[in-house]
Structure formats: C-alpha cells, structure tokens
C-alpha cells in the first residue's frame, strides 16, 4: 500500500497482482483511500457491501453495474457514488481501468487483503 504526502505519480505506487485478471495500486490518506484498478474483460465483482462510501470513476473500458436494484452500463468518463452499506456488483465487459475512492479507508485493503467481491471464478 502506498502512502504519499505532497505530490507524486501513480506510476510510482507499487502495483499488486490480485489475480491473473486483476491488479491494483492503493494510496491511502488518513480519511480517504484511492484504488486504481486494472480489470480484464469477463471478470465479475460479486455482490457485496461495505460500510465505506465509494466513488467509482471509469477511466477506460466498459462494465455493467448494479447498485441496490438499479443497473447501468458504465463507460469511460462515467462515475457512480455508492453509499456505505448498499449492495453492489459489476460485470466487466471490456478490459477496464477505473479509480475507486473510499471514505474512510478500507481496512481490508490497508492490510493487503483481497477484495470482498473476489470470486473463485476470477482466479
């Protein structure tokens, strides 16, 4: 997990290989966390929830997202805000780069843990 005070480059934050289809770079401050993801087409982020508020910013690619009972297609440039405690999941239809912002920071990610949505099928 990367920490930074002041200025820097995302490229200098170590990339973690989660599976053959998922990598991430984690940068955390005291009150929020940014996670840059690279996720291959065909990956499913299984239904899950967490107490953290989450903002999703699609940089590249395409996915179908479900937040509670609402479904949307997200493309590059799209954003979504997910309240803490709300169930959500994503199906990645193209190789995708996205940025998640979490507040407060995800304790499981600080410890280097796998995402709660990781399913056996994604390995």
PLM features per residue range, with description:
Residues 20, 33-49:
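Conserved short histidine dyad/triad with adjacent acidic residue
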Residues 62, 79-81, 111:
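A beta-strand edge to alpha-helix "cap/lid" segment located at domain peripheries
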Residues 1-31, 111-123:
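A short, N-terminal "cap"/entry segment at the start of jelly-roll beta-barrel domains
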């Amino acid at each position: 997990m990367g920490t930074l005070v002041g200025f820097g480059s995302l490229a200098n934050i170590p990339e973690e290989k989660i599976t053959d289809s998922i990598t991430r770079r984690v940068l955390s401050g005291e009150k929020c966390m940014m996670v840059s993801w690279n996720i291959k087409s065909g990956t499913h982020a299984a239904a899950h929830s967490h107490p953290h508020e989450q903002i999703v910013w699609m940089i590249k690619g395409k996915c179908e997202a479900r937040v509670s009972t609402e479904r949307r297609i997200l493309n590059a440039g799209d954003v979504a805000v997910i309240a803490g405690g709300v169930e959500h999941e994503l199906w990645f239809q193209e190789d995708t780069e996205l940025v998640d912002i979490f507040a407060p920071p995800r304790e499981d990610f600080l410890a280097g843990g796998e995402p709660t949505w990781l399913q056996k099928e994604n390995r």
